[in-house]
Amino acid sequence: MEQKVILFQGDSITDADRNRTNDLSMGCGYPTLVTGHLGAAFPYQYKFYNRGIGGHRVVDLYARIKADMINLKPDYMSILIGINDVWHEIGGHNGVDAEKFEMVYGWMIEELLRELPDLKLMLLEPFVLPGSATRSNDENPGRWEYFRSETDLRRTVVKRLAEKYDLVFVPLQERFSAANADAPEDGYWLSDGVHPTAAGHELIKQAWLEGFSKL
């Protein structure tokens, strides 16, 4: 039986501390949860790759398009990118503004679809919550508003690109916001407002599988 290839692509949320020297390593996040679910439900039908790399912005992801995407010849692929394009600006003035984010993301999608015309691609929405990495503080009283508003811009871009290229869009912000509405303190779903806990990765897995069912 020829296995279909599923590729998870993104930043640290996808990377989730995977062993980058071991192709079988899915990390400690939603790719492992999805792999376990699909692997048990459909034995031997899929081969899985996780190529998320912590800290990456959309420009870093695009730079890896050949080695970590096209050369793997995926049948199905998900992309979750965007939070570092925001975070790197507030942390080191090295972010990617929303206009350039959309331009580069669009180039990447077009190249993927051109080189892999049968690829089934879904775009996951970036998300953020108040947390230790995102809340305002004395040094940066506008920190949370910046994170929220800039992430919102990139969420809008990802949805617009999914519509433009007729791709599956996987919403995540509302799922996290709703889950967090009654949280007694920060950190239950996203440990620092950006990185998911085990429970947060389960939310992504659920949304991922819903999106996958539409491919």
Can you name each region flagged by the protein language model?
Residues 1-54, 64-73:
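Serine-esterase "nucleophile elbow" of acetyl-processing enzymes
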Residues 2, 33-44, 60-215:
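Alpha-helical cap/lid subdomain in secreted, periplasmic
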